């Protein structure tokens, strides 16, 4: 029997409906965020649509990180069409686009049973910190490092070191993504780096528009002082604005009460 739905590729005309699907789940993404994610997926992976009678009822994105790794995200099936095997069919299509690669994803509690049924295993939990940003009032850095080295704005000559550092510390081959993020930054978006006394890059962070306001991410740093300094530098003009940071749950980096005063030795944010 023919399936009542079909898989094909998302187009620019689908962005608004994708946004509506995510709004139904109370996800914060803007249409501009969807446009960016779909663009990356179509260039380096797959952007799949599920349609029934020409209507978009589901979507999902796959991103390739080099030849060995990939990730899947933004997987949604309209609530009216759930429990019909559509999510599994969509997910298998995304996996095909990442064949031969180790695949990672961030799952909601609702989606976790589906992913576990397909062989995925939980390796950690993510924690989200967000709120209206207030200037930090914490203690001075504990290490004798100058403020300029702790965090300064990215300079063109920093880019090769930033890309190498990201691949080494994050474990993903994603220079195209980072270069696209940096090239597409608006005038009020920021990238900051941290360097040591020998000029070696040992941390970076990006502040960009996302959802209800701003997100800090990616964020990587070799120590607490550098991670905190990067966040301070990136957010120094965002007082009162809505800011979000996502971190691994076992990274006690930015407590909800004062998300700018602590970070453990290796702080990572998507």
Regions found by a protein language model. Give the residues of each.
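Conserved G/P- and acidic residue-centered "switch" motifs that form tight phosphate/ATP-binding loops
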Residues: 85
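Short amphipathic alpha-helix that is part of the acyltransferase structural core
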Residues: 1-33, 123-129, 135-174
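Conserved active-site tyrosine of GNAT-family acetyltransferases
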Residues: 115-120, 255-259
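A short helix-loop-beta-strand connector motif used in the catalytic cores of GNAT acetyltransferases and
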Residues: 30-32, 37-49, 55-58, 69-71, ...
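Conserved catalytic-core motifs of GNAT/GCN5-like acyltransferases
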Residues: 102-106, 121-135, 267-270
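Intrinsically disordered, low-complexity, positively biased terminal segments
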Residues: 1-3, 11-16, 51-52, 64, ...
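Conserved hydrophobic beta-strand within the GNAT/NAT acetyltransferase core sheet
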Residues: 72, 103-108, 245
């Amino acid at each position: 029997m023919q399936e009542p739905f079909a898989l094909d590729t998302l187009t620019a005309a689908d962005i608004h409906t994708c946004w509506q699907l995510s709004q139904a789940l109370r996800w914060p993404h803007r249409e501009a965020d969807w446009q960016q994610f779909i663009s990356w997926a179509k260039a380096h992976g797959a952007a799949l649509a599920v349609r029934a009678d020409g209507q978009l009822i589901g979507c999902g994105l796959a991103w390739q990180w080099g030849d060995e790794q990939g990730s899947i995200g933004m997987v949604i099936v309209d609530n009216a069409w759930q429990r019909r095997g559509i999510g599994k069919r969509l997910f298998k299509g995304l996996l095909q686009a990442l064949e031969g690669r180790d695949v990672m994803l961030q799952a909601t509690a609702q989606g976790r049973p589906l992913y576990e049924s397909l062989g995925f295993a939980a390796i950690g939990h993510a924690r989200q910190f967000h709120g209206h940003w207030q200037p930090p009032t914490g203690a001075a850095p504990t290490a004798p490092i100058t403020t300029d080295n702790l965090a300064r704005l990215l300079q063109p000559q920093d880019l090769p070191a930033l890309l190498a550092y990201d691949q080494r510390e994050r474990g993903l081959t994603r220079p195209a993504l980072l270069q696209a993020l940096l090239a597409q930054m608006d005038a009020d978006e920021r990238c900051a780096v941290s360097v040591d006394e020998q000029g070696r890059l040992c941390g970076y962070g990006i502040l960009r528009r996302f959802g209800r306001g701003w997100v800090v991410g990616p964020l990587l740093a070799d120590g607490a002082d550098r991670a905190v300094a990067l966040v301070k530098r990136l957010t120094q003009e965002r007082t009162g604005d809505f800011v979000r940071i996502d971190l691994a749950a076992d990274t006690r980096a930015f407590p909800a009460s004062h998300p700018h005063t602590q970070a453990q030795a290796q702080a990572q944010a998507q």
